[in-house]
Every structure is written in structure tokens, then in C-alpha cells.
Design a protein with these regions (language model features):
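Histidine-rich, glycine-flanked metal-binding segment
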Residues: 1-27
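Metal-associated gating/positioning segment near the N- to mid-region
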Residues: 19-87
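Short secondary-structure boundary/capping elements
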Residues: 20, 41-45, 72-76, 101-105, ...
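Alpha-helix-loop-beta-strand connector modules within alpha/beta enzyme cores
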Residues: 25, 74-95, 139-150
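Hydrophobic faces of well-ordered beta-strands that scaffold small-molecule active sites
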Residues: 27-33, 61-63, 92-96, 120-123, ...
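Active-site mouth loops of central-metabolism enzymes
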Residues: 31-44, 65-67, 93-106, 172-180
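Short, ordered loop/turn segments at secondary-structure junctions
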Residues: 65-69, 97, 125-126, 153-154
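Histidine/acidic residue-rich metal-binding segments in metalloenzymes
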Residues: 105-198
Length: 198
């Protein structure tokens, strides 16, 4: 929308669009998308995901590491960068794993991943259960200047739940997930972030 500020007139060849009630943006950013390449191309590819993003006004996608193999080493990051250069219509930023293979037992080589070009760390879909491992990850991520996006869900509380616990879940006969499943993990991570500065 041209608006009125500083605009005396528009050339006759320009099409003026009334932007009242609309949002003008240079491009949206999706901080949590699942492109699934490599390994799960039948779910989504970098090419298809970037096309969908572009159609929706997203010019940057942050790709979660729930791929096969997971984004837990520099070779996988380089493969993804090659696919991005070849197939993507938008900017795609890979997110690396916090732990090797997203299994929560041993930290991934976070410095190697950062050097290879990841923009954050996550074990997307699975929380980092081990509090000391999460504490160490926060320390390393602080040193690297990259954030961690933990999947805040205590699965011992969420069990087989498929939706928020409450009257709708009960009415539908579906297992609910109590709010405490997220709240407990969030409280732990806040305490760890305060302790580490991460």
C-alpha cells in the first residue's frame, strides 16, 4: 500500500492496492518447521517445504533435526546445505541436535554443528530428560551464542495423551495431556537457564 506519507502521486502504470486491514511484511520466519530431508522424504522434502513456505509468505524456515540421520554432525549439515542450494525457494536454516541421534544420552558435537552452520539446537519431538546433560548443553550453547529449543514435555505425565486434558478430551473419549506435563519441564529448564545463564 502506498499510503499517504511522502507520496504525492503514483505513476499511471502503477497498480495501487488498498492495504486497509492487511499486514505488509518483507517475509515471515517459521522458527519450527519439519522438512524431514534426509530420510523421510515421503513426509516432506526441502523443495516441497520451501514452496509451501513461499506461498504462505515465509521467506525463512528453521528446519528441525528430526531427520534420518538426525542433524547431529557436520556431514548432515553439509548435505542439507547442498539440498538447500539446489532445491529451496526460500532461506532455510538448519537446527542441530542437542544430543547424538536425538536419544538424550550424550551431547552432540555442538561446536562442530555451530561451525557447520546450524542456528540453534533441539532434540525436537523428544525432551532432553537428563537435567545435567541439559545443564551442560546450556553452558555450551551460551559459549556458542546459539539458543536451545527444548521439547518441553514430561512424557511420564503425558503418557499416551493426544490432546489437552479437560472436558473435551473426556467427552471425545481421548486420553488427555495434563498441563503439568509441560509445566514441569519448563520449570526445570528455567531453573537450569538461571543457574547457567544459558
Amino acid at each position: 500500500a502506498a499510503g499517504t506519507l511522502g507520496v504525492e502521486s503514483t505513476p499511471g502504470v502503477c497498480r495501487v492496492i488498498d492495504g486497509t486491514g492487511l499486514v505488509a511484511s518483507p517475509g515471515f520466519i517459521d522458527l519450527h518447521c519439519h522438512l524431514r530431508e534426509p530420510g523421510f522424504e515421503y513426509k516432506e522434502t526441502i523443495a516441497a517445504g520451501s514452496k509451501a513456505g513461499a506461498k504462505g509468505g515465509f521467506t525463512t524456515l528453521c528446519a528441525m533435526p528430526n531427520t534420518d540421520p538426525p542433524i547431529d554432525n557436520a556431514a548432515v549439515v553439509e548435505f542439507i546445505h547442498q539440498k538447500i542450494r539446489k532445491d529451496s525457494l526460500v532461506r532455510i536454516l538448519p537446527i542441530g541436535c542437542v544430543t547424538k541421534e536425538r536419544k538424550g544420552h550424550e551431547l552432540a558435537e555442538m561446536e562442530e554443528l555451530a561451525s557447520a552452520g546450524v542456528v540453534a539446537f533441539s532434540d525436537d519431538g523428544d525432551p532432553v530428560y537428563d537435567a545435567n546433560l541439559m545443564r551442560l548443553a546450556l553452558v555450551y550453547s551460551l559459549d556458542l551464542g546459539l539458543p536451545i529449543s527444548n521439547h518441553c514435555q514430561d512424557k511420564s505425565l503425558s503418557c499416551n495423551g493426544v490432546m489437552a486434558e479437560g472436558p473435551v478430551a473426556t467427552h471425545l473419549g481421548l486420553d488427555g495431556i495434563p498441563a503439568a506435563a509441560e509445566e514441569a519441564m519448563i520449570a526445570r529448564d528455567i531453573a537450569l537457564a538461571e543457574a547457567t545463564g544459558g
